[in-house]
Amino acid sequence: MPHDDHKGSRLSLLLFYFLAFLLLWEWLRPLDSFTETKHTGFFSVFIGLTFLLTFFRMRWFVTVPFCVIFTLISIHILFYQGSIFDLSWVSSFLQDVYLNITLIQSGQWNDMIPSFRTLLFFVLLWLLVYLLHYWVIYQRRILFFFLMTVAYITILDTFTPYDATFAVIRIVLIGFFMLGLLYLERIKLMERITLPKTSVLKWFLPLSVLVLAATGFGLAAPKSEPAWPDPVPFLKKITHQDRVSAGESKIGYGNHDESLGGPFQQDATPVFTWQGKERTYFRVETKDTYTGKGWIETDTGMSYQLSNGKVENLWFDHKVATERRTVRVKVDKHYGYNHLMYPIGAETIQPKQAVSLEMNGNTEQISPISEQAGEIRNMGNYTVTYNSPVYKLDELRKVKVRKNSEEYTFSDRYMQLPDSLPERVRTLAIKLTQDHDNMFDKVKAVEDYLGSNAFTYETENVTIPKNDEDYVDQFLFETKMGYCDNFSSAMVVLLRSAGIPARWVKGYTSGEYKEAGNKNGSIYEVTNNNAHSWVEVYFPEQGWVTFEPTKGFTNPAQFTSSDTKDSGSDSSSSPKKAKEKQKEEKKQPQKEEKQKEKREPAVSKKPSASHTNAGAGLYAALAVLAVLLVAAVLLYVFRSLWIPVFAVRKLKRRSDQHAFFEAYGALLKQLKRKGLPKRDSETLRDYAKRIDEKYDIEDMSKLTLSYERALYRNEDSSALWNDSRELWENLIKRRWS
């Protein structure tokens, strides 16, 4: 939409677009804090470039292809592999779009895949940029969007972990500057005057001083404690949800673990059933970087395709004795992730459906290759053959802790600790391990410490660390209560502080015994309640060894001492203690665990189908809200097309005394929407004459003459309306330009 000459100087336009960009950017900044939306930089660049194209008055045949190409390139980078010039991915993406459109038509909002949701988000941002352009440049108003932004940020600050302290300051500064400058522009437009730069400067300087002084005073002034610091419990109570504390989420697997802590609700939603002869933990992925608040994977790493379902041995040295086992997994049809759940030591994976698999070299997550990921909701039925390790304690005790990480055969990412980690955590790690001369006993000392009476397993009264608190430090020294995330994170951090390489693993426990089964083993059911996290420690010349620090849980790994017959592949040689623990597990269901389930990402490096767990209702609501917002924007932008049709249907058949007056008023509003407003100095007759002269017609003057007869002479308005109805209909339906 080109700018008219009276729309302002190029410098003022650039300033308005820049401020509008900053205001819209504030909507994007919190997304990665309270949702699983990642890579928001793509969205920020998109709105910035769209504003620039609008500023440079690019025509639609430049703007539209540019935005479409940028969107497609972004989606390819985020969701597809291979060269962007290999157009086969475009065909796959278009198939996904068609599939998701059918899902929308059938009301299956939860099943939309991330790449399609990302496309919708780009479209929504595009519409918002156009709407801001219209508001700021043509309407010279920003108050509504400013208030919406303030409301949005304050709601997030109240009900989510997002801290909006500085965001509110930025928004107030930007919003007040825009309000003041746009008010000046409206005065110039209404009075049809051109102000010299000195006059604009005289307006701008006091405005800047006033806004900055008010903001500074607000920051410096003493503030009393909030009278109502947390409204969430009250809102929960009046909605009969008071048993769920603020920040509580449902148990279940979640994609991201950047911010751990807080209570959770139980959720017995089935995830999968499995059949096998030995209980085991089912891995999903590992994380290597502790941030002080949770876990991330700093390097997404390369994924390699599994040839014929064969998995490279990433876990054990050839010296470690193993027992070959097989588990048959049946994933619940409603489970919304397409990754595999598999035991450590997986050797071959045989999916029932025709699908190629790949494993990420860093996270060790196994999922369909990216070309097939969008088509597969979950893995359905598959069989895993794996090697269950039997570790010899005397061999493990021969391993000494290396003096520095360079002596290990891998990068130091399994030794990483944040610089902000409190020193007392390192001191505790040294204190727990200094009396032992080998790695295994040091690890057991930490595991036993976390299993002592000093710590309590708790799922409800669990706090979230404040901004200046470390997650592990708070658990070890302040609360000393929590669930698997607390125990496993604490153990990894303590081990790394003691110079022992370790990593954080998440997945599921073996679940609950369901039925006897057949020769292939017993059948177990795993639900969201069995989501869990544990620890794996790297022993040189042995491999990764599983440890279980969480109270009430049993380590599935097998250990045998030197006086026990070598295990080999004979399951009967497993240690008696391990067998007793397995029997105890059958009698006593494992305590319910959790991985905090957060909202589905708009984008993720490896897409999976949408899930239907705790966040599904929120995603559906957001999808409906997005569609309604897009519809509202479209209705507003194109209101000059549909309002006349509505007005004609409403007024055409009326013959009462008020119909003519309402119809003429509707026509004036339509002309104003088309950029032909009546000037304050004009009479109706002068205005009608101007319209007729501009478009070489006489209809407006004829209609106005009849209107004045009804208005000023009090003639029968009903009869005049009947005579003038056709003129009015022609005028209001006319495509003014």
Swiss-Prot record:
> What's the source species for this entry?
Bacillus subtilis (strain 168)
The entry's localization annotation reads: Cell membrane
Which SUPFAM superfamilies would you find in this protein's record? Cysteine proteinases (SSF54001)
Sequence ranges of Basic and acidic residues compositional bias: 581-603
Entry keywords, A to Z: Cell membrane, Membrane, Transmembrane, Transmembrane helix
- Name it: Uncharacterized protein YebA
Show the InterPro entries listed in the entry: Bact_TGase-like (IPR052901), Papain-like_cys_pep_sf (IPR038765), TgpA-like_C (IPR025403), TgpA_N (IPR021878), Transglutaminase-like (IPR002931)
Alphabetical GO CC annotations of the entry are:
plasma membrane
Gene name on record?
yebA
* One Pfam family here: DUF4129
Q: Where are the stretches annotated Disordered? A: 556-611
Q: How does it sit in the membrane?
A: Multi-pass membrane protein
Q: Which residues cross the membrane?
A: 11-31, 36-56, 60-80, 118-138, 142-162, 164-184, 200-220, 618-638
Q: What main location does UniProt list?
A: membrane
